[in-house]
Amino acid sequence: MDSNTVSSFQDILMRMSKMQLGSSSEDLNGMITQFESLRLYRDSLGEAVMRMGDLHSLQSRNGKWREQLSQKFEEIRWLIEEVRHRLKITENSFEQITFMQALQLLLEVEQEIRTFSFQLI
């Protein structure tokens, strides 16, 4: 995994956890949790690609991995929409920068997961 991506995830998660968005802090915590889950999933897919022999163990361990992959893409799309919405409504420059970087990272991760999945298919 790219070390820049790891630090980007960590940086964005740290900054998002410091944000106070009033009544929507519960939503923000949900976004943070999904970001972390997405990072772990992307990492595990990347590791499986690196050990191409793991394709069979990945498939046998999780017979529904294509369904899981589809679910992750849905989560990414939801997060992208949520981040775009937050970006539109916030006037705080710190939050704007954080959400712009989160959006960029989500788009990069979506592309990485897509690339990994094509290699595994």
Swiss-Prot record:
Keywords: Host nucleus, Host-virus interaction, Transport, Virion. Pfam families: Flu_NS2. One of its GO terms (biological process) is exit of virus from host cell nucleus through nuclear pore. Its main location: virion. GO terms for cellular component: host cell nucleus; virion component. The keyword DNA-binding does not apply. Belongs to the influenza viruses NEP family. It is found in: Virion; Host nucleus. Mediates the nuclear export of encapsidated genomic RNAs (ribonucleoproteins, RNPs). Acts as an adapter between viral RNPs complexes and the nuclear export machinery of the cell. Possesses no intrinsic RNA-binding activity, but includes a C-terminal M1-binding domain. This domain is believed to allow recognition of RNPs bound to the protein M1. The keyword Transport applies. Interacts with protein M1. May interact with host nucleoporin RAB/HRB and exportin XPO1/CRM1. Average number present in a viral particle is estimated to be 130-200 molecules. Gene3D superfamilies: 1.10.287.230, S15/NS1, RNA-binding. A motif (Nuclear export signal) lies at residues 12-21, 85-94. InterPro entries: Flu_NS2. This is Nuclear export protein.
